[in-house]
Amino acid sequence: MGRGPSIEGRKNASDAKRGKIFTKIIREISVAARAGGGDPSNNPRLRTAMDKGLSSNMSKDVIERAIKKATGELEGVEYEEVRYEGYAPGGVAVIVDCLTDNRVRAVADVRHAFSKCGGNMGTDGSVAFMFKRLGVLSFAAGADEDAVTEAAIEAGADDVVVYPEDGAIDVLTAPDTFAQVKQALATAGFEPAHAEITFRAENDIAVDGDTAVQVRKLLDMLEDLDDVQDVYSNVDQASLGA
């Protein structure tokens, strides 16, 4: 009878996944610091990236080095932001955000993934209109729904969504009010379990059969690319299955 993965093998896989997450966060910290300066109190994007790093158990020393490299105090790599758009099989719209030090490599890798999985890249704006850019502050079950809602609306949030199945809460904001709402909620004693500025599809598309397999394969391939930070799609996640 065959043996399952060894403890060492599982640990190596876990370490590799953690390393990839750290790499993406460090790139986000670098770009945020270079664009808006190294002081998180005056740079909401940097503050958000730092919080993401700390919540992923990244050390403060690693974060500080990334900031110093970005601001020129230490030698470092310069990354640029690039966005690609396209379609997966079944007409599923996909947005791919990259932070890369080699634009030629990034576009080649993204194009290869689309092609290999039966999709195709589009031009700028070809699918972006199907998504809304917004801030999302997520609170786990157990948060005081009324208190969070009141504090969020007073701080300028656009909407508060409560999920009846588990009691989780999402506070939705415009991108330019995300930082102030997040700070106001923190001051009121409410720290989100997760906070980000993201894209959400206006309408989801359900897929099945071979199409679902190919869509899932494409999204996984894109997520695994070193230059890719985030992948957004309008696929109904439930239709992709396990």
From Swiss-Prot:
Q: Does the keyword Cytoplasm apply?
A: yes
User: What GO molecular function terms would the record report?
Assistant: DNA binding
Q: Which domain of life is it from?
A: Bacteria
One term under GO cellular component: cytosol
* Record keywords, A-Z: Cytoplasm, DNA-binding, Transcription, Transcription regulation
Q: Which InterPro entries match?
A: Integrase-like_N, TACO1_YebC-like_2nd/3rd_dom, TACO1_YebC_N, Transcrip_reg_TACO1-like, Transcrip_reg_TACO1-like_dom3, YebC-like
Q: GO biological process annotations for this chain's record?
A: regulation of DNA-templated transcription
Localization annotation: Cytoplasm
* Main localization of the protein described in the UniProt heading: cytoplasm
Q: Which PANTHER family match?
A: TRANSCRIPTIONAL REGULATORY PROTEIN YEBC-RELATED, TRANSLATIONAL ACTIVATOR OF CYTOCHROME C OXIDASE 1
The family note in this entry says: Belongs to the TACO1 family.
Q: What is this protein called?
A: Probable transcriptional regulatory protein XCC3027
